[in-house]
Every structure is written in structure tokens, then in C-alpha cells.
């Protein structure tokens, strides 16, 4: 399978995205961006776009590079994955790709227990309901953000309030919609010069032409074409069914079909990392990030297995204990352990009196150890399991054998002590 380099970033490379990307309709990119352009224009100029300006924007979006459209779709799919409950993500992939009978796919509710809303563009000022986004993405139906009331759930849906299964979502059609469909059909047949249109009795009344004004810039044939075209068409990405990523949960187990992925790299090469940065990094109490405990085995585990380790739908979690503490080495993390406090051997002279009489400093809010930077106590090993004493250094010998004594009355020792 050939991938465009622009899409192989660590954020968008995920089996969930790989499997669903070929099923995203091409109209989704144009539609969401066109609505955003119109809102931005209205806020800036306090007037709506003219038809010529809107048509120019539409043509610009339609002619955008396929790699740009694919990258946008990958980011949006990554958002949708986080909003779908962990136990339903596998079912969502199987049902959208047609490898399983449609079943309910529940999303994470908002604070009020209702269906969530997301922004489909970066720094967008508009949010869309998840079920609306699903219909636009996978069915190619150009719905407005205010069309949520027109959506109806299938009678087979067990949780209509939170289900985002595209096959369970339908658009209610009113009488006006039926009338407009008939009117458009008659208009198209009149332009094509069909024999039935020559009958004056079947011609639509003349007043109908003055009753409707098309506000959009898409025509019927153009809408149908972009709603049926996959967003991956025209890119360097070929998504035949037999080359969908070979995750065991991407196909029906009873079918016996083994879906394989053909990459340009040799079979022995390591598969690129398939988890996003936010899943492999955990925040420290100070906001820093460090690899999660499961990251060393991330290359050999599937994304579904990694999802099972997460108890909440969010991908970021706080560690139970602070990274740096004055606890014993056994209590500290084996990956990011700091040297604990030891009793340092006395250094003759002034240095010993300073260390012995000085009170320990208050705890620092920064994630750095506050111990004095001096050699640890003589022992066979440091607290770190991989650091040992040099072979020539006897642990039982004190440091006074290796550090010259300090004599304030001697000018040589005083000079050498301060000059280091």
C-alpha cells in the first residue's frame, strides 16, 4: 500500500484511521470548509458572499490537493475515535467497512448526558453534532449544522440519544423536499430535451420558476458526484479491499479471509508506530510528558489492546505518585528514579562543617532533586542498578584518601582548594 508522506505523521497513522479513510466521502472536505469560509467572510465584511465569490471558493476547495483532503480527514477521524466509546470502536470499523451487520455505536456523552459536538476544522468557530458529522462523512449528504432535528434513528437503535452509527441515522424528508425533488427533476428533463417534456400538460407551471431560488453553488450532478467519490481518490493511496490493514478485528472472523497489507518496505522491517503521541505520553505533575508504562511493548500490541488498558475515554491521565520524591529506591520508578538521600562521608575541613550544620532546603516545585550534588555513601552499588563503582575504587576506603586535606594555615592548600 502506497502512502503519501504528508499523511504518515505520528498523529494520523493509526489502524482505525487507515481502515475508515477510504470510506470518507470527498464532499465532506469541501462542505465543511465552505461553511467555515462563508462564516468567516460574513464576520469580516458583515455581509454574505456573492454567488461568484462562493462559487470561486467551492472550485478552489474541490481542486485542493488530495493529500491535503486526506490529512484533514485523518485528523477528523482521530477526533471521532476519541469520542466513540472504547468498547464500540471495533464494531464501528467493522460496520462502516461492511464486514459486520450494523449495530449501535455509542459515543461519549457531554456533561449534560447528550450527544457531543465537535469542531471539524482547526480553530473553527462552529461545532457539529457527532451524528451530523457521521452522515456527512460516510454518506456524503450535505447537511447544515442546524439540521440536527431532521435526523432520525433506526427502529433497531437501542440508544437513539448517543448512537452515532451511520447506518442507523436517516434524514427525514418533508413534503417540501419531495416537491423540490420533483421540480428539479422536471428542470433537468427539460434541459435534456426528453420527449416527455414536450407535452405541455406535463410542463411545470411557470410560476414555479419564480417561487424557488437556488441559494447554493452546487448543481445536482456535481453534488452526486462528490458525494459518491471517496476522499482518497486521486492520491497515491490505493485502498483495495484486500489491502486494508491486517488487524484481526478488521474482517469477519468467520469469513476466513486474511487481509494483508503490502508496504513498500521489506517484510522484515519494523512496522511504523501506530499510536498517537497523546496515547503514548503521560503528563507529570508539572505538565511534562514521559512514556507510559505500556510504551515499550507498544510495537507488538494492537490499538484495541492498548485501548483496553485505558479505564476512561480520555487518552491523558495523571500518574498516581509524583515522579521525584525522597522515598526509598524501591518506591521510586525504575525508569525515572533519582538518587535518594544518603549520609555523605565527612570531608575534612570547612566543607564538612558546612554540610553537617546546614538545614535542608524547602521542597522545590520544580521536578528536580534537591539533594546536595556530592558522591553518595560508600556501598557496593549505587541506587541505580546499572551504575557501579570503578574497579580500582575500594568501597570501604573513605574519600579522604583521594581528596587532599584542607589546612587553612597552609597557603598552598588554601590556594589549591579554591582554584579547584
Curated annotation (Swiss-Prot):
Residues 189-208, 252-364, 377-420 are annotated as: Disordered. The keyword Phosphoprotein applies. The keyword Transcription regulation applies. The modification Phosphoserine is found at residues 264, 292, 295, 312, 328, 333. Pfam families: CTF_NFI, MH1, NfI_DNAbd_pre-N. A motif (9aaTAD) lies at residues 397-405. Residues 325-340, 407-420 have a biased composition (Polar residues). The 9aaTAD motif is a transactivation domain present in a large number of yeast and animal transcription factors. It is linked to Macrocephaly, acquired, with impaired intellectual development: An autosomal dominant disorder characterized by postnatal macrocephaly and borderline to mild intellectual disability. Additional variable neurodevelopmental features include muscular hypotonia, motor and speech delay, attention deficit disorder, autism spectrum disorder, and behavioral abnormalities. Some patients present corpus callosum dysgenesis. This is Nuclear factor 1 B-type. It comes from Homo sapiens.
